[in-house]
């Protein structure tokens, strides 16, 4: 049977771009593949950029990411959900992969080029990031990897590393296949300036207080053609229209689109209708998240169980890897 693996950055509370772009897909895949689907909060990846993480908050953000995923419906009793640093085999396999991967292949990664340009002295962890990512995936012999399109190059390198290892030490790893969520939309930031991103500060968090969400929507830009209330607009050129596609039922969507094009409704009324449906959609998630935070032992026990399940697979694979590489076994 196929096995799914996906890494989740410990960014704390995810935003609606994460939710519609990836998290809902995790739930669907979890229902399809059960315990053959593994989801890992990749806290080791988080520290590859020393200036981009806070050691005082990393543990809490890791915990919060587990809460958020459980709250949207990812059931830890039906999938394997764990924390990367709790399974030391990730680091061990990553080191072995760095020994078979030419530096040039790591240096040509587009993300490395983009991120390294920010540093006067580039941390080596940033360069080795793809080798660790390859270890994350291949350690579980996963063949399905749901990722964003920005990770395509890393998946191709993972496949190349698998081929190199198999050539050098014997057939061991399958070459994983990247799976993209074709239904995922490119969700614009609430400021209208490109894609929603925490680094840009233009997000709507799925666990954000509704009052804060409304304040963001209230001042969010709309179709610039609607200078006056009586001016018709084009909802396809308005980020509020984009958000309605995510949250509103068909009848509301029809009302909004017709009302915008005929100036039958104003932008404020359109935003209020959107806020109603955002609240309806996110309130059960926020309620469940509050319950989980009130019962941290449940979350920690679920993570411990996931750690054990992941290690059971990882230790078996690493025994095979060590034997093929030639390490002494006592």
Curated annotation (Swiss-Prot):
Binding site for ATP: 9-11, 17-18, 148-150, 187, 195-199
GO cellular component: cytosol
Chain ranges for the short sequence motif 'HIGH' region as given in the UniProt record: 10-18
Signal peptide extent: none
UniProt keyword annotation of Ligase present: yes
Compartments where located: Cytoplasm
A molecular function GO annotation: tryptophan-tRNA ligase activity
EC number per UniProt: 6.1.1.2
Swiss-Prot/TrEMBL keywords: Aminoacyl-tRNA synthetase, ATP-binding, Cytoplasm, Ligase, Nucleotide-binding, Protein biosynthesis
Pfam families referenced in this protein's UniProt entry, alphabetically: tRNA-synt_1b (PF00579)
Origin superkingdom: Bacteria
Enzyme class per UniProt: ligase
Subunit structure: Homodimer.
Name of the protein this chain belongs to: Tryptophan--tRNA ligase
């Amino acid at each position: 049977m196929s096995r799914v693996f996906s890494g989740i950055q410990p960014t704390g509370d995810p935003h609606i771009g994460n939710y519609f772009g990836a998290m809902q897909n995790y739930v669907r895949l979890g229902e399809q593949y059960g315990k053959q689907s593994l989801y890992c909060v990749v806290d080791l990846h988080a520290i590859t950029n020393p200036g981009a993480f806070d050691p005082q908050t990393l543990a809490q953000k890791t915990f919060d990411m587990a809460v958020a995923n459980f709250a949207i419906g990812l059931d830890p009793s039906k999938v394997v959900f764990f924390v990367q640093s709790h399974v030391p085999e990730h680091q061990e396999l990553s080191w072995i992969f760095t020994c078979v991967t030419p530096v040039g292949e790591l240096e040509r990664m587009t993300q490395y080029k983009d991120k390294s340009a920010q540093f006067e002295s580039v941390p080596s962890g940033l360069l080795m990031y793809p080798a660790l990512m390859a270890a994350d995936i291949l350690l579980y012999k996963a063949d399905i990897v749901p990722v964003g399109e920005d990770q395509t190059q890393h998946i191709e390198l993972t496949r190349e590393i698998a081929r190199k290892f198999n050539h050098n030490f014997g057939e061991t790893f399958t070459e994983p296949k990247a799976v993209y969520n074709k239904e995922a939309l490119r969700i614009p930031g609430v400021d209208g300036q490109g894609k929603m991103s925490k680094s840009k500060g233009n997000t709507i968090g799925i666990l954000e207080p509704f009052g804060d969400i409304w304040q963001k929507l209230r001042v969010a830009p709309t179709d610039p053609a609607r200078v006056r209330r009586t001016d018709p607009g084009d909802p396809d050129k308005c980020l509020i229209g984009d958000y309605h596609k995510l949250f509103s039922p068909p009848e509301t969507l029809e009302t909004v689109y017709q009302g915008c094009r005929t100036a039958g409704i104003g932008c404020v009324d359109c935003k209020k209708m959107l806020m109603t449906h955002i609240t309806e959609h996110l309130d059960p998630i926020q309620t469940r998240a509050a319950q989980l935070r009130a019962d941290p032992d449940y979350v920690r026990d679920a993570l411990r169980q996931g750690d054990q399940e992941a290690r059971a697979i990882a230790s078996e694979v690493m025994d095979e890897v060590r034997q093929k590489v030639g390490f002494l076994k006592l």
